[in-house]
């Protein structure tokens, strides 16, 4: 059941501007809109091109279910930026042939979000010698789509767990124990998020809002979102 996350406009703008700074849409670039509007990542496709010089290409509904049609569209429209959940990315990678690789040469960034990205998927992605970089993005809707970013590379294809990276600009991440104790580097704890990207709370659900959006003990006057996810800082 949808929780009714109340996201502020300025939080959306912050996310979109940081994406543009990190993964710019240049004059001849294009991003593919193929994500259903009920999934928060669709916001980055619908409006992400506002801050760059590229363009938006709208895919027909269900295009992901037709890998060959997707490959043809990437080639025809010279798509440079594209989003996948890891499970769908794995399905797409399984369908790529040597001929298809030629159709994917326009890609610059392949974004993976919404699920854990496996080392198997990373290994397969880089086995195709595509020009694109695979980006691992993490963030609940409560932090306005993305909170952290990690650029994968060919050398990490044997890793068991893929890092989620560091917070994007204007977002802070805390690894805590019992809410008010910061965990040392390398020690697991609950991942909490604060900063400009934080949502206002849940619509008409004050109890859940109070439970998940707590006072930030490390930044007085600010709120902190409890993700419930375990994480640790790498050395």
Predicted regions: what they are:
Residues 3-32, 40-80, 150, 154:
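Conserved AMP-binding/adenylation subdomain of ANL enzymes
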Residues 9, 35-37, 42, 56, ...:
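Generic structural signal for small/hydrophobic residues in well-ordered secondary structure
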Residues 51-55, 79-83, 93-163, 172:
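Gly/Ser/Thr-rich phosphate-binding loop
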Residues 6, 40, 58, 64, ...:
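Short aromatic/basic micro-patch
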Residues 11, 37, 42-43, 69-70, ...:
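Acidic donor-diphosphate engagement hotspot in glycosyltransferases and nucleotidyltransferases
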Residues 24, 39, 63, 118, ...:
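Nucleotide-sugar-dependent glycosyltransferase donor-binding/catalytic pocket residues
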Residues 1-8, 12-15, 25, 31, ...:
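A generic "structured core" feature
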Residues 12, 119, 127-136, 151-235:
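AMP-dependent adenylate-forming
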